[in-house]
Amino acid sequence: ESHDCSVDVCYNTAIPIGVANKYDAVVLSPGPGLPEESGDLKVFVAEFLGEIPILGVCLGMQALAVQLGGTLYNQQVVKHGVQESIITKRGVLFSQDDSEFEVGLYHSWAVSKEGDYTITAESKNGTVMALENKSLRCYGVQFHPESILTPKGMEILENFLEEVAVETPISAE
């Protein structure tokens, strides 16, 4: 709500499927669990992908990736409360190519590189850390922009809001 945005928080078992189009954008929050174990998450993504801008964070990105033809795999090394460097490519969420910065990780699953999306950030070991499908207006980050371990987190969220505002004015109440 710090950017004059009106915010509703919904449990994944009570996502307002029938009225979701009243929103200018949606942020799909972190887990725990997998997309298929997360209430109405997969149903919501299937119904509204391409209808309204969506930013997926961690589990939210995984749900977007699966809907876009990607797969999930269990990482050999679990990353909970770990800060790592990522390398970005220019996209909606990142303003520069080959920018490197620290992000906070809290996950044990990752997404494949194959899917109907462009990879916009990777860890140094090649794990997908961000993706986008601009034509469907969906964007995802595997890391946590809301974490203190992600110093540029607010900038990433602002980039999403700016993209949404260009395409669909953000309503403020």
Model-flagged regions — what are they?
Residues C5-I15:
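A short beta-strand-loop structural module common to alpha/beta enzyme folds
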Residues Y11-T13, N74, L105, A121:
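Short loop/edge segments at beta-strand edges and connector loops
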Residues S6, D24, P53-L55, E102, ...:
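Structural signature of beta-strand start/N-cap positions in the alpha/beta core
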Residues A14-Y23:
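Short amphipathic alpha-helix with an adjacent loop that forms part of the alpha/beta core around
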Residues V92-S135:
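Catalytic beta-strand/loop cores that center a nucleophilic Ser/Cys/Thr
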Residues I148-E173:
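Acyltransferase
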Residues Q83-S85, V128-A130, G140:
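Conserved hydrophobic/aromatic beta-strand scaffold that supports enzyme active sites
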Residues Y23-S95, L157-N159:
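Cysteine-nucleophile active-site neighborhood
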